Structure formats: C-alpha cells, structure tokens
Amino acid sequence: MSEISTALSEDCPCQSSHHYADCCGKFHLRQAFPETAEQLMRSRYTAYVLKNIPYIVVTTVPSQQTLLKPRLLQEWADNTTWLGLEILKTESLTKTQSAVEFKAIFQGEECEQAHQERSIFVKIEDRWYFVDPTVSLPTMKQPCVCGSGKKFKHCCGGFL
C-alpha cells in the first residue's frame, strides 16, 4: 500500500489526465466504486502499475476470485514495467455487460511491447467486475459466472 500513498498526489497511471487521488485512487482505497466498465478497466491497469494485487482479485467476478493465483499475479506485476494505456473501444453489450478493448504498453526484456485485449465486464449488485478468461470457465450448460441464473452460453459465454 506504500506505493498507493506515494502516488496520491501524482497523475494517475491510467492516463485519464486526473490526479490519482481523484481517479483510480478512490477505487483502490474503497472510497468509491467504478461506475463504468472503462473506469474499472483503468483502475485495474493502475493496480497492476502499483502492484496492488488484492484490488485485482476483488474486482474479478466473485465466482472466479478463488481460482486466481495472487502469488503469480504479484510475481508478474513485480517483473513488468507498465508504460501506458490506450482505451480503443468501449461497448455496452447489455444492461449488465460491457466490453472494453484496450492496448497496454509495457517494457519487455529487450524492447517495448503491447498487450491488446477485448475484456468483458459484468455488473452484479451495482458493481462492475472483470470476467477473467484465463481461469477455468463453466461449460456452456452450467450457470453463468456473473450469477444471473442463466446458462453460461446464453449470458457471458456469448461474449468470451
């Protein structure tokens, strides 16, 4: 958390042109919750920059949180230098599902590299969560990860 406290007066790493305290900092300190999927995406990127792995875990859809490996996430964060974030596109898929396409620039072993992804976010009880496609997902006939009660194939599975 020391990196968070030192960053409060600095520009936010998510490149929103706001100070961290007025942007992602309030989400990291749980003073507020992201109101949009894009805000959650930006706050998760910033959490990686600041190595705030607990925030990464709690902003992943609850049914997937126990499947994450915080130690591996921490190792990855410790060995990655993030250089920038560009939001390419945001889409509202349904009232409770959105997609954010982004490009994150980071320093690789020999040169700068880019990670581009289209991430899916779901809103559960008025809070946005990231659906992690890298952990085990339900089969198409099982209940959806978002807790909607629908089968996965008729809900979030259609977007992943």
UniProtKB/Swiss-Prot annotation:
Covalent S-S links between cysteines: none
NCBIfam families: PRK00183.1 (NF001213), PRK01752.1 (NF002486)
PANTHER family: ADENYLATE CYCLASE-ASSOCIATED CAP C-TERMINAL DOMAIN-CONTAINING PROTEIN (PTHR33747:SF1), UPF0225 PROTEIN SCO1677 (PTHR33747)
Family of this protein: Belongs to the UPF0225 family.
Protein name per UniProt: UPF0225 protein CGSHiGG_04185
Species of the source: Haemophilus influenzae (strain PittGG)
